[in-house]
């Protein structure tokens, strides 16, 4: 390990990143709370302000990926489609196999200039995660319980609110419903066999109802669906902790722009269309494992400096008073004060580790496991 790599793996560096993220995130959450008074007066202004506030937080994680770890993402796509990216609303269908797949999606959104306006269909539990979950509430993320009887009306109502959104956005949906694991895959393929559907090797059976309602509600304002198939070179298994340690990964993502008019309006036909899409995605993954590349022309969108500038702003604002506080605490010489300081550091470290744990595959959602669910019905 070189000197830079050794430095990146040090706890003190991680402490600095975590402090800046937590402190700035809580400040942003507080400002977002204050902006609620704007909503009844000017809803569109409220949305624009909160998109920028959201960027202040989410771009810090993108900075870690792009500038700290140096991770790169190569896009494989039709050159005729790339001029549309970032210039239109789109529904993004992304496979859900890696711990940092969401972060790669954010990186792409940042390079397209629309990170602050990125939306996602997420499990309701994430709304209670400090900073990120609270921030998402103010930018109209769509939360679901993953119980269709409860979600049918609430998800549709939330989606319809996005029809008059004032800026371009990407709406991400993981149709598999949960992150891929071997256990969940085995159960999912049993369901596929029972329904007479072709088996998938690299994906779970897609849950079609969430996708169908999303397309139905946004059809008139979203001109395309982006089918994104993500993988990593050299069979890497990237983690958020690895990114924090400065480990560099190289992602490859195959992006297909599918015009909305190519997707059936009928719910049953839309469901069949999505199953066919996932069979194609599976074939693309199989080809990638065989050859190491996806179809179409490789393209690397240029890295923008704004995520780094944003982090440097927050660091310069927050670190000086933080270190002043540390010096005063240490110089006090009080054993009680020092013990309190150590306790605060331990609690902060545990809190950040818990938030990182939300992304870890082996500690992820039990959704899709046969022990905690009924058989899939969509």
From Swiss-Prot:
Keywords: Acyltransferase, Endoplasmic reticulum, Lipid biosynthesis, Lipid metabolism, Membrane, Phospholipid biosynthesis, Phospholipid metabolism, Transferase, Transmembrane, Transmembrane helix. A motif (HXXXXD motif) lies at residues 96-101. One of its GO terms (biological process) is phospholipid metabolic process. Pathway: Phospholipid metabolism; CDP-diacylglycerol biosynthesis; CDP-diacylglycerol from sn-glycerol 3-phosphate: step 2/3. It is a multi-pass membrane protein. It is an enzyme of class 2 (transferase). Its EC number is 2.3.1.51. InterPro entries: Acyltransf_C (IPR032098), Plipid/glycerol_acylTrfase (IPR002123). One of its GO terms (molecular function) is 1-acylglycerol-3-phosphate O-acyltransferase activity. It holds the Pfam family Acyltransf_C. Its main location: endoplasmic reticulum. GO terms for cellular component: endomembrane system; endoplasmic reticulum; endoplasmic reticulum membrane; mitochondrial outer membrane. The chain crosses the membrane at residues 11-31, 125-145, 311-331, 338-358. It is found in: Endoplasmic reticulum membrane. Converts 1-acyl-sn-glycerol-3-phosphate (lysophosphatidic acid or LPA) into 1,2-diacyl-sn-glycerol-3-phosphate (phosphatidic acid or PA) by incorporating an acyl moiety at the sn-2 position of the glycerol backbone. Exhibits high acyl-CoA specificity for polyunsaturated fatty acyl-CoA, especially docosahexaenoyl-CoA (22:6-CoA, DHA-CoA). Belongs to the 1-acyl-sn-glycerol-3-phosphate acyltransferase family. The HXXXXD motif is essential for acyltransferase activity and may constitute the binding site for the phosphate moiety of the glycerol-3-phosphate. This is 1-acyl-sn-glycerol-3-phosphate acyltransferase delta. It comes from Rattus norvegicus (Rat). The gene is Agpat4.
